[in-house]
Design a protein with these regions (language model features):
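Active-site-proximal helices and loops of the catalytic beta/alpha 8
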Residues: 158, 164, 174-241
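Substrate-binding/active-site clefts of carbohydrate-active enzymes
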Residues: 2-15, 22-31, 38-46, 52-166, ...
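Short, Asp-centered acidic motifs that coordinate Mg2+ and/or phosphate
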Residues: 47, 170, 198
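Short catalytic-loop micro-motif centered on adjacent basic/acidic residues
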Residues: 102, 170-176
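Carboxylate/His-rich catalytic cores and anion/metal-binding grooves
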Residues: 48-49, 215
Length: 241
């Protein structure tokens, strides 16, 4: 399938290191993580992928801490991690050490008390009773309505915020196949007027090939499971993909 966007040069043969800020240090803060940057650079890490850094919704929260993937604002920092200034310091230092930074982006849904639920309720899907809902049974999030073009532009504006204000280098897009592929095309086309970015999709390209016209990389789970089966059981059990 022909790609619609070029791959940024530094992303060829790169590696990606996932950062869970809450769990990475005893403090669970950006400032505490900052001290680890030289060590990570020395290890040969090239791209830091931060799991969601946005604040977590209170309504229907999972446990006492909540899920990173149920955000209450797309343009704020989770206060338990620190401030935008703290995160910008990480990006500046990472860049100085030759590393890039991408952030997790959750476009399909928000937390149940996201600021848009009050300011822009039309941004959300509703069930037959007229209530916000999630189609996949996740009870701490509600689905966004991608038929609403104003919502699409608001989402792109929020993504742009992190590029302009903090200088991030790309996005890891959570459950990317749940969001229409034409939105990702629209977002990439507009956002790369600012700078060329790296786009990583959480999806299997063997099952969602059309998305790879837009994304640079993805998770080939089907191939991974097939190769593991080959290792564990032998070639006679492998079916052609």
């Amino acid at each position: 399938m022909e790609k619609e966007f070029g791959l940024i040069s530094w992303a060829r043969n790169t590696n990606v290191y996932e950062v869970n800020t809450r769990q990475y240090t005893p403090e669970g803060t950006f400032q505490a993580f900052f001290a680890h940057l030289p060590r990570l650079a020395e290890m040969g890490i090239e791209v830091l992928w931060f799991m969601p850094i946005t604040p977590i919704s209170m309504v229907n929260r999972k446990g006492s801490l909540g899920s990173y993937y149920a955000c209450s604002s797309y343009t704020s920092i989770n206060p338990e991690f620190g401030s935008v200034k703290d995160f910008k310091s990480i990006i500046d230092k990472a860049h100085a050490l030759g590393m890039k930074v991408i952030i997790d982006w959750v476009a399909n849904h928000t937390g149940c008390d996201h600021e848009w639920t009050k300011s822009h309720p039309a941004f959300y899907k509703r069930n037959h009773e007229g209530s916000f809902y999630d189609a996949h049974g996740w009870d701490d999030v509600i689905d966004l309505n991608y038929e609403n073009h104003e919502m699409r532009q608001a989402m792109i504006a929020c993504m742009k915020y992190w590029i302009v204000e903090c200088g991030i280098d790309g996005f890891r897009c959570d459950m990317a196949m749940l969001t229409p592929v034409d939105f990702w095309h629209q977002a990439r086309q507009q956002l790369e007027l600012e700078k060329q970015l790296f786009w990583l999709a959480e999806l299997d390209p063997l099952e969602n090939p059309s998305y790879m016209r837009v994304f640079d990389a993805a998770y080939t789970w089907k191939w991974m499971h097939a190769t593991k089966q080959f290792k564990d059981e032998g070639a006679r059990h492998i079916h052609i993909l």
